[in-house]
Amino acid sequence: MAIERTFSILKPDATARNLTGAINALIEKAGLRIVAQKRIRMTREQAETFYAVHKARPFFGELVDFMISGPVVVQVLEGEGAILKYRDIMGATDPSKAADGTIRKLHAKSVGENSVHGSDATETAAVEIAQFFSGNEIVG
């Protein structure tokens, strides 16, 4: 399996509960390296652009409001099969359906406040990484 990069966001519900270290430990335990990380407060424009794929969905406004409600931690993760590996350790979007030991089973509050985001494909990972990081911020 190839070394690849994926994008991660630790959402406001996770940062509000100081879970960055606990989530990072799960990421690293799974064999992924955190090659870039920063804590930011997303602007409304950033959140609307990031979640533009959901613009027509009824939850779009609520999602954007949630993502700008507090700090987030944006990350670039690297490793063999990083995209699928991170999606596996995140767990199902609905924490009640997430497997034991996954980030969402351990830390998510609800479907809406599900602690983390991870890219779903190579192409989306590249776009999402570029939205928040310049090349010199990624130290692989």
From Swiss-Prot:
GO terms for cellular component: cytoplasm. Pfam families: NDK. CDD domains: NDPk_I. It is an enzyme of class 2 (transferase). Major role in the synthesis of nucleoside triphosphates other than ATP. The ATP gamma phosphate is transferred to the NDP beta phosphate via a ping-pong mechanism, using a phosphorylated active-site intermediate. It comes from Nitrobacter winogradskyi (strain ATCC 25391 / DSM 10237 / CIP 104748 / NCIMB 11846 / Nb-255). GO terms for molecular function: ATP binding; metal ion binding; nucleoside diphosphate kinase activity. PROSITE patterns: NDPK_LIKE. The active site is at residue 117. This is Nucleoside diphosphate kinase. The gene is ndk.
